[in-house]
Amino acid sequence: MAEPAEPIDLNAADITALDSLPGIGPATARAIIEERTRRGGFRSTRDLLRVPGIGEGRFARLKDRVRV
């Protein structure tokens, strides 16, 4: 999939938008949505670090491609 030109809003993105991010597949996209739902939304992009499978390295690749 092509990378989006604008950062993706973590609080509004659907599974397809999240799956378009580098290093994020369908399972991780679902985990992001589950964490977002559980927390009532993300307050910071660093909240992605609470998602299973997203560590500092993966977050470093994503941080400029996402927003809240």
Predicted features along the sequence, with ranges:
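N-terminal, intrinsically disordered low-complexity tails/presequences enriched in Lys/Ser/Pro
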Residues: 1-8
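Conserved hydrophobic/aromatic packing and binding residues within compact polymer-binding modules
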Residues: 32
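Residue-level signature of tetratricopeptide-repeat
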Residues: 35-36
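Short, exposed beta-strand-loop hairpins at the edges of beta-sheets
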Residues: 49-53
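Short, solvent-exposed mixed-charge patches
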Residues: 67-68
